[in-house]
Amino acid sequence: MDGLPGRALGAACLLLLAAGWLGPEAWGSPTPPPTPAAPPPPPPPGSPGGSQDTCTSCGGFRRPEELGRVDGDFLEAVKRHILSRLQMRGRPNITHAVPKAAMVTALRKLHAGKVREDGRVEIPHLDGHASPGADGQERVSEIISFAETDGLASSRVRLYFFISNEGNQNLFVVQASLWLYLKLLPYVLEKGSRRKVRVKVYFQEQGHGDRWNMVEKRVDLKRSGWHTFPLTEAIQALFERGERRLNLDVQCDSCQELAVVPVFVDPGEESHRPFVVVQARLGDSRHRIRKRGLECDGRTNLCCRQQFFIDFRLIGWNDWIIAPTGYYGNYCEGSCPAYLAGVPGSASSFHTAVVNQYRMRGLNPGTVNSCCIPTKLSTMSMLYFDDEYNIVKRDVPNMIVEECGCA
């Protein structure tokens, strides 16, 4: 994982970053990196939070005035951290936006989202805070992909979707569905009767590019509306083949006779563009920490959690991150007296690994003092565009610092 430039971290803290446990927003430090908005004042010289000697194992950490453009460096480190957690090499190149009508329709169907007066999408639980109930549960990634069309394939309509597997080669598809809008045109029916049609969705069989399987559904229609068709098997086969393009052929029996129109890719019907939703399970380790840490309130110099918020609009990322609007990049700061050392939990084990590395290098571990570092990290839900203009809803683990401790 990327962190601050090498000049800003000592060997011990670099080891913690390499372990994938400490994020750039969560550095243990005697002096915290300043924040973009309302940064806390630097600790006075000689205070527990202001001395470099307080945390010898992070001895490479420099005071803000020694780093020059620390604000820019810090924001770049946060950007790299977010991209790393999303398993992306760089931010997506958004050259043309998905039609907002199509996006909003999909989000409303799946997340009960709404559009604010300023045009931004607001979705419950995607506010930059930790995801409720996410820790200790299975991680599930959700991908929304909108249809494109190759035109007609005999009597069927060919749709295709580019579906990203989120950088994970071993995703297990929990559920996947095609959402298709069926529109009713004026038609004379007997009172109380409905229009009954049969929709067939064809997808390529695994291992046989020239053979197609079919999902069939009989639909009784009283009004225009959305209908779903299961595609779990098709998407799982796609991932197992290592492919990204999903080809679907759609056929509707009796639609023409009964004045039923499946809406495909029509510039005049963007809010009804077909889309595929994939829910896939992510295997990720879970951390359970027992001890609750202090909040920085300006009245203590002991190890505590400092909160701050980064608005994605201010760093130019609001074009590809739909929700949340920003990131709570909390970090740890403060002194670690001897009586606070050895907080139980993952932090202790990582600190032990660092000390062992010092021993291997012939250094005296007795000179390595405790560092104020994260002891609990939580999950954050994000909704964003990937390079293929899929809308991805993902619960990203270890994103937000919840508690700090000494180790």
Swiss-Prot record:
InterPro entries: Cystine-knot_cytokine, INHBB_C, TGF-b_C, TGF-b_propeptide, TGF-beta-rel, TGFb_CS. GO terms for cellular component: cell periphery; extracellular region; extracellular space; perinuclear region of cytoplasm. Residues 30-47 have a biased composition (Pro residues). GO terms for biological process: activin receptor signaling pathway; apoptotic signaling pathway; cell differentiation; cellular response to calcium ion; cellular response to cAMP; cellular response to cholesterol; cellular response to insulin stimulus; cellular response to interleukin-1. GO terms for molecular function: cytokine activity; growth factor activity; hormone activity; host cell surface receptor binding; protein homodimerization activity. Residues 29-292 form a propeptide. Keywords: Cleavage on pair of basic residues, Disulfide bond, Glycoprotein, Growth factor, Hormone, Secreted, Signal. Glycans are attached at residue 93. The keyword Mitochondrion does not apply. Disulfide bonds join 296-304, 303-372, 332-404, 336-406. It is found in: Secreted. Inhibins and activins inhibit and activate, respectively, the secretion of follitropin by the pituitary gland. Inhibins/activins are involved in regulating a number of diverse functions such as hypothalamic and pituitary hormone secretion, gonadal hormone secretion, germ cell development and maturation, erythroid differentiation, insulin secretion, nerve cell survival, embryonic axial development or bone growth, depending on their subunit composition. Inhibins appear to oppose the functions of activins. Activin B is a dimer of alpha and beta-B that plays a role in several essential biological processes including embryonic development, stem cell maintenance and differentiation, haematopoiesis, cell proliferation and wound healing. Signals through type I receptor ACVR1C, abundantly expressed in pancreatic beta cells, and type II receptors like ACVR2A or BMPR2. Upon ligand binding, these receptors phosphorylate intracellular signaling mediators SMAD2 and SMAD3, which form a complex with SMAD4, translocate to the nucleus, and regulate gene expression. Dimeric, linked by one or more disulfide bonds. Inhibin B is a dimer of alpha and beta-B. Activin B is a homodimer of beta-B. Activin AB is a dimer of beta-A and beta-B. Interacts with FST and FSTL3. Activin B interacts with BMPR2. This is Inhibin beta B chain. It comes from Homo sapiens.
